[in-house]
């Protein structure tokens, strides 16, 4: 994934970006983490420079996130060989733009979502497994956001090389190795 880099958030009265532009060129940060957001509200010159880069730009509509304990969150769902192995909730402040752990989000235990999303777990599981199978992958992390009001799950992205959780939460490496060893290979 992009690790939360290269994002511009535009909402009426609230424009933020972690892009840096120098002389109409995209400037890379010296490190791959902590790409801080800066306020660019009503800075039309910034938008013009961004559009002039000629790069592919993805524009997405914001989905208002369901909150648990007054925290915005998403779910990293680990799928291996057609089975859901772990749901890893990642939470951040309600006004945060991203849920990436390297950018300030907090990894939660699965208990964080229990009670609030019990009715959605089956649909989340089916969506995650189907998306991984559609791309013909054996292993992936599927990022899912739950919409405020409807509690409808949305797939945000699929990561063929997802970061792993800490083993004390769930040892995803062990689960992947077990699944590989359990396969019947021709």
Regions found by a protein language model. Name each.
Residues 1-100:
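Phosphate-binding site of ATP-dependent enzymes
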Residues 4-6, 104, 141:
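Glycine-centered flexibility sites
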Residues 58, 140-142:
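A short linear hydrophobic-aromatic micro-motif
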Residues 76, 143-145:
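Short, surface-exposed charged micro-motifs
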Residues 90-94, 145, 150:
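Short glycine-enriched loops at secondary-structure junctions
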Residues 100-139, 146-186:
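C-terminal active-site "lid" helix and adjoining low-complexity regulatory extension at the edge
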């Amino acid at each position: 994934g992009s690790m939360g880099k290269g994002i511009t958030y535009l909402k009426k009265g609230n424009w933020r970006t972690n892009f840096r532009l120098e002389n109409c060129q995209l400037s890379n940060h010296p490190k791959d983490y902590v790409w801080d957001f800066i306020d660019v509200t009503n800075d039309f010159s910034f938008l013009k420079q961004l559009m002039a880069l000629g790069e592919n730009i993805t524009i997405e509509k914001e989905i208002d996130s369901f909150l648990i304990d007054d925290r915005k969150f998403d779910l990293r769902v680990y799928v291996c060989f057609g089975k859901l192995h772990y749901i890893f909730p990642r939470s951040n402040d309600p006004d945060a733009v991203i849920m990436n752990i390297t950018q300030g989000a907090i990894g939660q235990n699965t208990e964080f979502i229990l009670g609030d999303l019990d009715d959605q777990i089956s649909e989340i599981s089916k969506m995650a497994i189907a998306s991984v199978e559609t791309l013909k992958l054996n292993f992936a992390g599927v990022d899912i956001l739950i919409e405020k009001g409807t509690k409808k799950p949305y797939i945000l992205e699929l990561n063929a090389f997802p970061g792993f959780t800490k083993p004390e939460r769930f040892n995803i490496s062990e689960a992947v190795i077990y699944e590989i060893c359990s396969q019947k290979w021709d």
